[in-house]
């Protein structure tokens, strides 16, 4: 990723502050779905149960209008802010996944109407690039940075198009091809245009360079050699496009694909998959009960490549004192400056550090896209099935989260800031491209990424998600204090817009169909 795009990826907590227009949502009583450590799942968490019903009630009472009016009409259309697309995915991908699991066709059609309304904002791609793109012309990031203004912000496009492609793929077996304003055909065509534009000789050369790179090749703070979420999202788009094409054999011709263009896509997809494979580190841990041959496999992503990156300068510092303090100038109250209290030079880099757990939430929907479309990807692109992440590898990532990220405290669950298990400060004095001051996240400061990030859909983590559900709904003072300290998005008063958004991100991840994910 470019350094500037990395800066534009604001943490979830900061993005929630921009959800003010969701205040229309109403508070309601939450049923007590008691946490269980194994055994039968609470009936409240089944598809069709009260928790799913509450999610859709929130959606009907304010979520739909928030997307339609705030994200799309105000930010995307009026301001030209394509970060609205980024936030739409962050806030509502878990909702979409629940709608698909529970087979809510009408809800998916409702989401499709919202997504389709963004297609009118596509414009000719900048310069001599082919196809259409969402061009960022306003909003905090693109107004503040001349480097982003009037460009396609690749992060926003890949992330949103992965959401749209998943939605269209799920509907491809229900909506008849050739119908007026066919959402599936529209989305497949837009996916083709974008994938073809991103698949340049320069992009392929950069992928080959990164495939060959090793952590020791990173010499400075540059992100040039990183595996980023943009690559994961592109693979997810390829996966769901394959699902659409497999479900509708005539769709390829309708959206302008032929054998030659499919072969070109395969070459790009192969490189993307090789990069993910090269950056996946799998280890075998001894069985905790000492059983022979029963070791546990854990996996991490991009380990060691991020050790020198600016956001991770304090990753080995686990103290309570803030390394940087943001102070307002008394003479100029609008001016906030960062004052360093503890220099970063005092701390050695964490050698094996990779992604933080907030960005690693992309793995949830990335793996889901792969798993839903394995056969289709082999059928459509002719790729080697072994090039796809295996189910064992996916399980190893879940084991890593369970064994190294979680603090092993079921009564008071917290989660380390980094997927490696490192738990130092994150994003101290981070510049997100808007000139704001950020003191950073202390140890366990990204714990809210677990409930909002979708991790509870992983079978190994579901019971812990149910436990956290109980804690966030508890009226006990000790529980409320714990939530306020570590899960602030769930600590606000019922009816608060930020809390409603957090719950609409979290609760769908707990809902299962027939006891299965």
Listing of model-derived features with the role each one plays in the protein:
Residues 83, 355, 376-517:
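CBM-like carbohydrate-recognition segments
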Residues 31-35:
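Sec/Tat signal peptide C-region and signal peptidase I cleavage site
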Residues 1-14:
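N-terminal secretory signal peptides that target proteins for export/translocation
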Residues 18-29:
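Bacterial N-terminal signal peptides
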Residues 38-43, 52, 96-116, 166-192, ...:
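Structural helix-adjacent loops and short alpha-helical linkers that scaffold large soluble proteins
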Residues 190-353:
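Active-site cradle of extracellular carbohydrate-active enzymes
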Residues 36-141, 194-216, 281-301, 487-517:
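Low-complexity, Ser/Thr/Pro/Gly-enriched N-terminal "stalk/linker" regions
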Residues 79-83, 87-90, 94-254, 412-448:
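Extended ligand-binding groove/face enriched in aromatic
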